[in-house]
């Protein structure tokens, strides 16, 4: 850490260290570092996607939803961002939102079978929930 409280190295270094922390199953630490990187490089889709994944893996579903939503606002045809938003919304109990974005991801990429599988799971949960 520097005297100003920022991590040592460049934003590129922070990004790669964040990915390493994710791979080592330290999502909270990864999210903290990647949030710094995203602040420094707000236009980087790679950093934002990694941040969203870290937030999701850390169980910070509302934050992950916000990050995936930012990705979608920059590229509405990003199937992975729709998938990520759908998964995060599902974990947050937002089943209608989850179904909407999982359906979009599955329609964009019918060849990615886990998109359709996640959509079926959310639809089954919605059917079991009378509210």
Task: Label each PLM-derived region with a short phrase.
Residues 2, 24-36, 58-70, 92-104, ...:
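Structural signature of tandem alpha-helical TPR/SEL1-like repeats
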